[in-house]
């Protein structure tokens, strides 16, 4: 059984998650562009939902890539 190191959230409770804050959103996606799960990010359920929506919005307006092309 493997254990994940729970990361402390850089987002304070009640702090808004903005889709234009690309530096913050990049902390919650993998090198390939996938959204990290809640058990790794340490966010609350509500924060994780808001984060997912913000990442998807920023992908639609081309602030973040859908996938990171390698090579």
Curated annotation (Swiss-Prot):
SUPFAM superfamilies: Ribosomal protein S18. It comes from Nostoc sp. (strain PCC 7120 / SAG 25.82 / UTEX 2576). Keywords: Ribonucleoprotein, Ribosomal protein, RNA-binding, rRNA-binding. GO terms for molecular function: small ribosomal subunit rRNA binding; structural constituent of ribosome. NCBIfam families: S18. This is Small ribosomal subunit protein bS18. InterPro entries: Ribosomal_bS18 (IPR001648), Ribosomal_bS18_CS (IPR018275), Ribosomal_bS18_sf (IPR036870). Belongs to the bacterial ribosomal protein bS18 family.
């Amino acid at each position: 059984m493997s254990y994940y190191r729970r990361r402390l959230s850089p987002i304070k409770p009640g702090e808004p998650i903005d889709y234009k804050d690309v530096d913050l959103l990049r902390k919650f996606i993998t090198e390939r562009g996938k959204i990290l799960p809640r058990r790794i990010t340490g966010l609350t359920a509500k924060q994780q939902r808001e984060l997912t929506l913000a990442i998807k919005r920023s992908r639609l307006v081309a602030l973040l890539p859908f996938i990171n092309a390698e090579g």
